[in-house]
Amino acid sequence: MAEYDHYEDDGFLNSFNDSSQEEHQDFLQFRKVFLPCMYLVVFVCGLVGNSLVLVISIFYHKLQSLTDVFLVNLPLADLVFVCTLPFWTYAGIHEWIFGQVMCKTLLGVYTINFYTSMLILTCITVDRFIVVVKATKAYNQQAKRMTWGKVICLLIWVISLLVSLPQIIYGNVFNLDKLICGYHDEEISTVVLATQMTLGFFLPLLAMIVCYSVIIKTLLHAGGFQKHRSLKIIFLVMAVFLLTQTPFNLVKLIRSTRWEYYAMTSFHYTIIVTEAIAYLRACLNPVLYAFVSLKFRKNFWKLVKDIGCLPYLGVSHQWKSSEDNSKTFSASHNVEATSMFQL
């Protein structure tokens, strides 16, 4: 993203970087190829996956639980997030040509939707904890929880806007050999950066560790058809979050405390690679939080059938069989599926 672009430009970086000119040119060439390619992959996969989740959630799936409310807001945030990537892709290959207003706007949109996504993931984690550990209470208060869920989602968007204000205020277009959209980190206090990292990484991580630990303990003491599948999904969710988000946030933490690392070309490689890996969450969220659901996959095949693609895919018979199996499964495992599916 443009947050780091001006630190990787020739004129700015060479003013304090003691690495050789050749190394720096190699880095710039790598960055010019690597970031646009990664942005394009995330954009295409994120656009398709999150659009599917939104369409199915709105037109094929009734909002029957608090998780359903979150699963409408999560793909919306990720979808808007990935839609900013083509602008950063073009700017990475060429330069920023979209003006100062668009620079501030896209920095704001990018950041708002990033933190909205992470906070919603936190809420989904807590909701899963309540549904599994406090199943009876959660079921009895379903209507009340739905109302609170909508209020919580609204608050999340507002909080994300407030946390993103520094990027919007300090975002600007700089002329450093070429036009760059970004901001000077010196103008953003350590307190603000710490707040952003807390909401964007440490809070979701803490929620996952605490809630999933209790959920795992509960599942291990319970029997049932889906116990092992639910445990696998939990470990997968945790592993994906840690592998994609930890490296980039660790780099951001180092960046905020040890500025001398900017003198190392290798540190800049680390920044752009870990950043690209962190963005993969926008592609993986639809799989981890939607397509693992049997009901969601069933609605997906309904969508495919409605748009007339089913005969061309040659899966009409399989879809019919899957639908019958879904009905059988729902009839025999209704209570269990209600609580476990959301894992």
Curated annotation (Swiss-Prot):
It comes from the Eukaryota. GO terms for molecular function: C-C chemokine binding; C-C chemokine receptor activity; C-X-C chemokine receptor activity; coreceptor activity. Pfam families: 7tm_1. Disulfide bonds join C103-C181. One of its GO terms (cellular component) is external side of plasma membrane. The chain crosses the membrane at residues 34-60, 70-90, 105-126, 145-165, 189-216, 233-260, 277-294. The keyword Transmembrane applies. The keyword Cell division does not apply. Residues 1-33, 91-104, 166-188, 261-276 are extracellular. GO terms for biological process: calcium-mediated signaling; cell chemotaxis; immune response; inflammatory response; positive regulation of cytosolic calcium ion concentration. Residues 61-69, 127-144, 217-232, 295-343 are cytoplasmic. It is found in: Cell membrane. Keywords: Cell membrane, Disulfide bond, G-protein coupled receptor, Glycoprotein, Membrane, Receptor, Transducer, Transmembrane, Transmembrane helix. Glycans are attached at N17. InterPro entries: CCR1-9-like (IPR050119), Chemokine_CXCR6 (IPR002235), Chemokine_rcpt (IPR000355), GPCR_Rhodpsn (IPR000276), GPCR_Rhodpsn_7TM (IPR017452). It is a multi-pass membrane protein. Belongs to the G-protein coupled receptor 1 family. Receptor for the C-X-C chemokine CXCL16. Used as a coreceptor by SIVs and by strains of HIV-2 and m-tropic HIV-1. This is C-X-C chemokine receptor type 6. It comes from Macaca fascicularis (Crab-eating macaque).
